[in-house]
């Protein structure tokens, strides 16, 4: 990941303005510590802080077309850049950067080229021939981008809010799958997949199509000129990413440079579920595994930094971002600059434990659509900013455009959790990789119950956060929360504590409006809380709030014969239909 900042039409091309742009861009340097670039044309500025992943020697930005009339600053990876270059043979490329194709595609197709890009990206392009500009963000919002407006009529774009929040009174998250055009005067959606309408699909489930499409998604993301690894918690999603990556690593260009030994990383409190499961999967796959330990106090000490970098006060995001933030620092110290991660699967397949209570396939499917549309405010935000805080790039194969289209076209009846048929959450994905002849994973890992990252690193992590917040937020403070924070009022002491820290860094009303709100249980949307009347009394984003579902649910007996464990064993015995 890199950091980008663009200021366009600011009616000021003075040296003081240039210095201010450099100062603001420096706030993003953690995202791209390898090099800095700045393009100035009259009163337009494109700044770039580079994390060199592809073509480290010559791919510095901003990037240009042949005569430099088109300049572009990009944060992202374009996985199909070689195929796109094949159709641009009349153009002269200056670098081997995957992002340079953007300038030349614009020359060929004007603004209608964004859908050709297969990757994660946020970019701003300036056409100096008529001083027009466009900005665009990838389909799901894997890559962060904000848009703001200066009092002088200027338009601002930045990878993180901290680069524009002081100079813009009005700003917001740039919506995923959209393009901003100065010629057309606003935003429009470029990404319009069939599932976006939330109409219930009817395509029969084909496990081999699911498997093959996911494998292609992982292979694409092995495009790198620097050392990389996989974040391996031992859960289904990260384990599948690691397993598939390992199978194809030997054939990749990355193996020629860095060897075919896959590095995997896991973090947790001492004795946590993730450490145990991650070690077991790493041993099974034969990876070079790195276990990182932290204490509750280590996490608490990092909370302020986490909120500053991740730019949110959402409880579940902060809980999960903190261990990921700590792990990323260690990963960077080992010389690794890119990691593969398992975000997105739970949204696509209904993997969160509250999906057990989905009343029918229509509501199940609509909830998965809502979850995917909101990913840029939650898991994408966490995965990107927690790692980018230390100059590490996270790639997410489950959020591949083609894979999402395949998975979201499946009749949701197949995704429904059916104890009577031995189908636990994400059975569609588990079954697709249940290969008896050439196993991807051990059965008990393939059918391990979902653990949210903030739970899996150790249950005492969340309990410790709550205890810490209770010491800093009194009952009186919480009772008066609606007066202190009338917008998106915190409902718990933990939420209040995070909000006070956030407001210290980002005091403007526009900043707090970038953070989502509303009731949630076990990471549900507000709409899904209606599925179980009991949930309204236990609004906690932890998976343990899914009473009657999680094997370690709050206030429930943790016995060996609990119903979810029985269901897991039944699922392991259910014959695969691959």
From Swiss-Prot:
The record marks 343 as: Important for beta-aspartyl-AMP intermediate formation. ATP binds at residues 231, 267, 341-342. Residues 2-185 form the Glutamine amidotransferase type-2 domain. The active site is at 2 (for gatase activity). Keywords: Amino-acid biosynthesis, Asparagine biosynthesis, ATP-binding, Glutamine amidotransferase, Ligase, Nucleotide-binding. One of its GO terms (molecular function) is ATP binding. It is an enzyme of class 6 (ligase). SUPFAM superfamilies: Adenine nucleotide alpha hydrolases-like (SSF52402), N-terminal nucleophile aminohydrolases (Ntn hydrolases) (SSF56235). This is Asparagine synthetase [glutamine-hydrolyzing] 3.
